[in-house]
Amino acid sequence: MPESLPVHVIDDDDAVRESLAFLLESSGLAVTQHTSAAAFLDAGVPLDRGCIVTDVRMPGISGLELLKELNARGAHMAVIVMTGHGDVPLAVEAMKLGAADFLEKPFDDAAIIAAVRASLGRSAEQGRQEDARSEVGKRIAGLSQRERQVLECLVNGLANKTIAYDLGISPRTVEVYRANVMTKMKAASLPELVRMALLAGVAPADDATPT
């Protein structure tokens, strides 16, 4: 559930940070406070799930610099940037760097809660996609070399006879390999198998022509 994902509030202003943390906690969210971007980065927080709410202007590492560092580390966290009046250009720059949203101070309580919940929802969905991609990748790794070749041919939309010709095996043997692939991939249908393969990055050839 999105509510179980962590929310990290980063602001050097104690009053703002504590007030925002209290507001989010009161709405049922799990919140951790950080007095600076450096403190957040030094905390060793997992960067694959959750949401960050950070001020754009902070001493040391600014909100924009934090976004750049998160990108460099391959983070998958939604980032909401808080800006002061007149900081819209900074907010636009933050969005270009991957921020999920920005809110101008003073912000409405309902608006910040809605923004955080929306970001957590996206983070949860992304997490599910990453988990699914990882699981499919493991299944593909369990295929034999020939089974992997048959899988790639199926993704390219090739018929059994064409696969047999391309691989130099009989159509009956292709059927056996195809059944093995379906079983190992735990796919209930060919469309599901293709979707799983595409999710894992098994891309069809540019010149592939279904036959």
Swiss-Prot record:
Required co-factors: Mg(2+)
Q: Where does Mg(2+) bind?
A: 11-12, 55, 57
Report what the Swiss-Prot or TrEMBL entry states about this protein's PTMs. Phosphorylated by FixL.
Function according to Swiss-Prot or TrEMBL: FixJ, when activated by FixL, induces the expression of both nifA, required for activation of classical nif and fix genes, and fixK, required for fixN activation.
Q: Report the residues modified as 4-aspartylphosphate.
A: 55
What positions does the domain Response regulatory occupy? 6-120
Coiled coil residues, start to end: none
The record, for PANTHER family, names: DNA-BINDING TRANSCRIPTIONAL ACTIVATOR DEVR_DOSR
* Gene Ontology cellular component terms for the protein in this record: cytoplasm
Q: Can you provide one Gene Ontology molecular function annotated for this UniProt record?
A: DNA binding
List the keywords (alphabetical): Activator, Cytoplasm, DNA-binding, Magnesium, Metal-binding, Nitrogen fixation, Phosphoprotein, Transcription, Transcription regulation, Two-component regulatory system
Recorded hits in InterPro entries, A to Z, give: CheY-like_superfamily (IPR011006), Sig_transdc_resp-reg_receiver (IPR001789), Tscrpt_reg_LuxR_C (IPR000792), WH-like_DNA-bd_sf (IPR036388)
The record's free-text note on cofactor binding? Binds 1 Mg(2+) ion per subunit.
The protein's superkingdom reads Bacteria
Compartment list? Cytoplasm
- Organism source for this protein? Azorhizobium caulinodans (strain ATCC 43989 / DSM 5975 / JCM 20966 / LMG 6465 / NBRC 14845 / NCIMB 13405 / ORS 571)
Domain (HTH luxR-type): residue spans on this chain: 136-201
Instruction: Identify the DNA-binding region of this protein by residue numbers.
Output: 160-179
> Which SUPFAM superfamilies does its entry note?
CheY-like
Its recorded name reads Transcriptional regulatory protein FixJ
Gene3D superfamilies in alphabetical order:
3.40.50.2300, Winged helix-like DNA-binding domain superfamily/Winged helix DNA-binding domain
Q: Which GO terms describe its biological process?
A: nitrogen fixation; phosphorelay signal transduction system; regulation of DNA-templated transcription
Origin organism lineage: Bacteria, Pseudomonadati, Pseudomonadota, Alphaproteobacteria, Hyphomicrobiales
The yes or no answer to whether the keyword Thylakoid is present is no
Answer yes or no on keyword Translocase.
Answer: no
Entry-linked Pfam families: GerE (PF00196), Response_reg (PF00072)
